[in-house]
Every structure is written in C-alpha cells, then in structure tokens.
Amino acid sequence: MKTLHFGAGNIGRGFIGKLLADASHQVTFADVNETLIDQLNHRQEYKVHVVGADQKLDVVRNVAAVSSAGHEVIARIITADLVTTAVGPNILDKIASTLAKGLQARFDAGNLSPLNVIACENMVRGTSHLKQEVLKYLPVAYHATHESCVGFVDSAVDRIVPPAAANDDPLEVTVESFSEWIVDQTQFKGELPQVAGMEPTDNLMAFVERKLFTLNTGHIVTAYLGKLRGYRTIREAIEDPVIRSKVRRAMEESGAVLVKRYGFDPRLHAAYIEKILARFANPYLVDEIDRVGRQPLRKLAAGDRLVKPLLGTLEYGLPSDHLQEGIAAALHYCNADDPQAVELQALLAELGPAQALARVTGLAADSDIVSAIVARYDSLK
C-alpha cells in the first residue's frame, strides 16, 4: 500500500510514519525541509527510540521523501492509496492547494480508485476542515468525482513526541511507548487500511474530546502552572506535589463533563487520568514547558483544551475551580520567542484581564466566570 505522509518532523517519523511503515506501507514523506528530504532519501531508514517501562530501539526502513513544494508530490498523490498529515494545525491549510492539484491530476490520469486522507493533528475534526480547504482549490467540475472516490477521515491522535535532543543522527527520534490513533470508520472510501495501532470507531467525537479534555488539558495546565513556578520541563512540574494535585483535579473536572456527555465509566476514566499523569512523569522524555505552552492564543480559544471543557462544566452545572486556575495561569504565560505569548501580554496590558480574556476566549467580559478567572489571575501575581 502506498502512503504519502505530509510532515517529516518528529511526530511524522516517530508516530504516524512508523505505524504505517510497520504495517508494510510504502511510506513517502513530503516536507519543505530539503536537508531532511535528502537525508531520508540517502539512508531510506531512521531510528526510533521507544521509551517507557520497556525501552527498545526500532529501525523504520524502506522510506522515501519528496518536497511538498515540488512536482514530485503531485505524482505521489496520483498513485497513493492513503494520504496522512502531521504538520500542525497552522500549516494544514497550506497543503490544501497541493492536495487539490494532486487530486485533479489523479482524476485526469483516470485513477478513480479509493483514496483516503487522514489529518493527524491536534484539532477537532481536522480532516473535515482540510476537506473544505481542498474544495476551495479543486475546480467544481471535479467535485462529484472527489466525493465518490476520496474519503476524508477524521481522527484523534495521542503520543508524546518531544523534540529530539542534539546528537549525531538528525533523523533519530524519541517517542513514548503509549500511542493512540483512532479513526472515524464511517468516513472511509473502500476498504479500511489494516494498520496495527490504528483503531476504527463509529463514535469518534467521544474519543476526540476524551483526549482533548484529558491529555491536552492536563498537559497545558501542567505547563502553565510549571512556568509560574520556574520549572523547565513537564516532568519537573508534575513531580511538584502541589502542581500534580491541581492538574489531577483539573482533569477530574473536565472528566466529569465527559462522563455526563458520553457516558464514560467514571472508574475507567479515573484510571485513564492516572495513566496520563504517569506519562507526564516519564523520566526518559525531556518535554520542555515552552514547547507544550507555546501558542497560548490558540490554546485559549473556545474550542480548545482549556475553554471547551470549562464551557462543558457550565453546561452541566459542574465545578471548574482548577480549570479556571489553568486559564488564569495561561494569562501569565510569557515567552519572548513566542509571538502569540507576546501578543497575549500586549492584549492584557492594553485591555486589562477581563476584556483580554473575553477577546481571546469568546467568554462575555461581564460574566461571572470571567470575574472568577480574573480573581484567580490576580491571586497568581
């Protein structure tokens, strides 16, 4: 099976690309980094350190790479059986025009066999979003063929892949042993690909929100509380018993929303929370707080990992004290190298916390919840 994967970074190589290669797919990475492309094509393999309770070194073999800005990527789309992405939400829109050109060329070449596209991004229904962007570039005359032949399959992905430490091998990547890749089986065209580690479901949103409200919420609360206390890594922060307790409580608050909304078993979800806390404390992962905390404006948006679970607590009349504290800590996030962090601090200086919070989150500036968060923001100074 031929797979084209957009994004040859650590997540692409260490997570999605690895699972596909392990399933005997012919994986071609598409990326803008010419040095990375040359290295992958020269060696056609790379090492993956899988770390956790059991450690192992895997070698991913028989891979290739092309420039995502060149003509060769179009040729790969013409013959691909599967297209996947791990480029980040901010870059996803930028590959839509390339994908549209490739699909047009595919149809012109007479290839009407099923093609499935899976965006493996930290965003809700990211593939559906990509589909709408692709349709903006694909001529209307091709839309009916596109609808019958191409499946845009939403997914939920979960694996911590920190930036690789400097070493002599630029292709080497370190990943945690845990991974989860859940796909919406109702959106595939043709047969579902058989990939160990890819789990089909007909209830994707339950798993999307479980991951967003637990892993992502816990991760970001750990980062922002850890930043306030001067820690550098997620592990350092989560080993602080005060922070660990607050992060657990925040995930319990968001978990109560999931139990109400989707009927998750409270005991099983409590065990899931404990598993995530253990993942944050993995001594073999050096996951920097500024990597997790970056782009605070995106992470404070209404549909993201802090405000969306908070809105759920308001919907169901549930407690939210520790989610509020996580949002308050986010407002304190400073990082001169992060344009969004700089913009956030400028908004706070210009508008004050209530109006700035309303601008960023969509919450009403005069609401009780904003007043409560501002009080926590002031108490953290």
From Swiss-Prot:
Keyword Transmembrane helix: no
Keyword Iron-sulfur: no
A GO BP entry: mannitol catabolic process
Any one Gene Ontology molecular-function term assigned to this protein's record: mannitol-1-phosphate 5-dehydrogenase activity
Key words, A-Z: NAD, Oxidoreductase
Organism listed in the record: Aeromonas salmonicida (strain A449)
Annotated binding of NAD(+), by residue: T3, L4, H5, F6, G7, A8, G9, N10, I11, G12, R13, G14
Gene Ontology annotations for the cellular component aspect, listed alphabetically: cytosol
Family: Belongs to the mannitol dehydrogenase family.
EC number: 1.1.1.17
A Pfam family it matches: Mannitol_dh
Catalytic activity: D-mannitol 1-phosphate + NAD(+) = beta-D-fructose 6-phosphate + NADH + H(+)
The name this protein goes by in its record: Mannitol-1-phosphate 5-dehydrogenase
